[in-house]
Design a protein with these regions (language model features):
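Terminal helix/beta-alpha structural elements that buttress the NAD(P)+-binding lobe
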Residues: 1-186
């Protein structure tokens, strides 16, 4: 509550859910997107500020928005292209949550150069770290469904693909053509 956070790929499916949820908890959300088309979408789903990382340096913009203080946490599902600048957005003892590779596999992190100077925390969680039992998975799922049911989180399907078009869906995902949740149906 009351924190400002950065979420990369804010207009994507995970981003849309995260940004709404964070805003409902009282956070100020800064989101990044890769096109002007996605700015409006990210704002619709809870971002207070949106940065097109193809037009401006998101680290510089975040530092400007925070009066050079930096952020307590960054959530990054993009990966390779954003990791180093994301670490630069963090304030002293900030936390970097790296959970995806949309731009490619992460390079090794130079702990002495990128982590140690500010005493940062870097984590790379997967769903298995939070839902190791069926009960934990059910509990986490129920929390999401409660947020959807209450209207705090709205989920709109961006596109439906038939199973025979699964390869097209994958290409669209890799090409960043998907603006929100997409599903494949039989």
């Amino acid at each position: 509550k009351g924190q400002t956070v950065l979420f990369h790929a804010a207009a994507g499916g995970v981003g849309q859910i995260f940004c709404q949820w964070a805003k409902s908890l009282g956070c100020k959300v800064i989101g990044t997107v890769g096109s002007d088309e996605k700015i409006k979408l990210a704002k619709k789903y809870g971002c207070n500020e949106v940065i097109n990382y193809n037009k401006e340096n998101f680290k510089d913009k975040v530092l400007k928005l925070t009066n050079n203080e930096g952020l307590p946490v960054v959530y990054d599902g993009v990966g390779k292209n954003t990791l180093e600048n994301s670490l630069g957005c963090l304030k002293m003892r900030g936390t970097m949550v790296s959970f995806g590779n949309a731009s490619g596999k992460l390079d090794p992190v130079d702990v002495g150069k990128l982590i140690a100077p500010k005493g940062l925390y870097l984590t790379r969680p997967s769903i298995a770290h939070y839902t190791s039992t069926r009960e934990e998975l059910d509990e986490a799922s129920n929390k999401l469904f409660e947020m959807v049911k209450s209207g705090s989180v709205k989920v709109e399907i961006f596109k439906k693909y038939s199973l025979k078009d699964a390869s097209i869906a994958h290409q669209d995902l890799e090409g960043r053509k998907i603006l929100g949740p997409a599903i494949i149906t039989p």
